[in-house]
């Protein structure tokens, strides 16, 4: 995961543009997760426990992930594998902020994985934000772009509306974001 990637810029902009009242936390320990192995699930490694705890504490999850060779990164897949069958992830509201307008292979693959995991994909909050190829190199560049900022603000509104709807129904603040 590159700290200066365009996905990191989008993640930083998402944090900067998060609505008031949104408690926004980034899970940045992907590199510490061992390769998923169901044989070691009984003695859960600490980074995997931290991931699961973060997901359990979240009302919604926002994923920012690049496309690699027409797919999601191995790191993202490994992170998701640690959540397969984890009850707090099931029906968890999830938004996907895709940093490339034309990265449809990874975008669709990620969404299919999330649907298989029984995530509650928030359609209006799953957006492609064309950071790649737009001369964007930082979160400030995204925030300064009226078009890109508007897409993010709209996606955030969809996240908040969805979470508020869940709360109004008496079911389960937006807390966890992962991958760069």
Predicted regions and their residues:
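N-terminal beta1-alpha1 ligand-phosphate binding loop
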Residues: 1-21
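N-terminal beta-loop-helix "entrance" segment that forms/cooperates
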Residues: 26-46, 135-139
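A general structural signal for well-ordered alpha-helical segments in protein cores
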Residues: 7-11, 48, 76, 106-107, ...
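Helix-loop-strand module that forms the ligand-binding subsite of alpha/beta enzymes
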Residues: 43-118
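Glycine-rich phosphate/pyrophosphate-binding loop and the adjoining helix
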Residues: 122-180
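A generic structural motif
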Residues: 18-25, 120
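Short, glycine/serine-rich, charged loops/turns that create anion-binding
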Residues: 1-2, 31, 101
